[in-house]
């Protein structure tokens, strides 16, 4: 049954990822805002959810964490987009993207952790 839950939540996460990409994607843009957006949102939600999750069953935590949020965020796309920016000699955008992804992700994770912690009290 666990695989079924992960598959269902994975479908939802992948669909949300696609919809977010459609919402934020601009073909003329040099900077990949859609990937940055989903990764920052996903990082925040995973941290918040992980800390708040004890009220849910182990199966639900795994299904939502692995299925929904795992399929919503994407590290491989970060790598491809960064290499693409470097190959087209958009070095500043590549550096900004990696920096925002790392530091923005850490900030979103910390914020999610703190808000999740506050909600448990």
Residue spans of the language-model regions?
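Membrane-interface helix-loop junctions in multi-pass transporters/channels
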Residues: 1-121
């Amino acid at each position: 049954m666990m695989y079924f839950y992960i598959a269902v939540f994975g479908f939802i996460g992948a669909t949300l990822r696609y919809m977010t990409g459609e919402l934020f994607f601009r073909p003329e843009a040099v900077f990949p805002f859609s990937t940055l957006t989903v990764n920052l949102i996903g990082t925040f939600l995973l941290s918040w959810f992980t800390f708040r999750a004890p009220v849910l069953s182990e199966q639900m935590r795994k299904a939502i964490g692995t299925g929904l949020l795992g399929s919503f965020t994407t590290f491989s796309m970060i790598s491809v987009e960064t290499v693409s920016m470097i190959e087209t000699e958009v070095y500043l955008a590549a550096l900004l993207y990696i920096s925002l992804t790392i530091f923005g992700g850490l900030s979103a994770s910390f914020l999610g952790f703190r808000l999740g912690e506050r909600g448990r009290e």
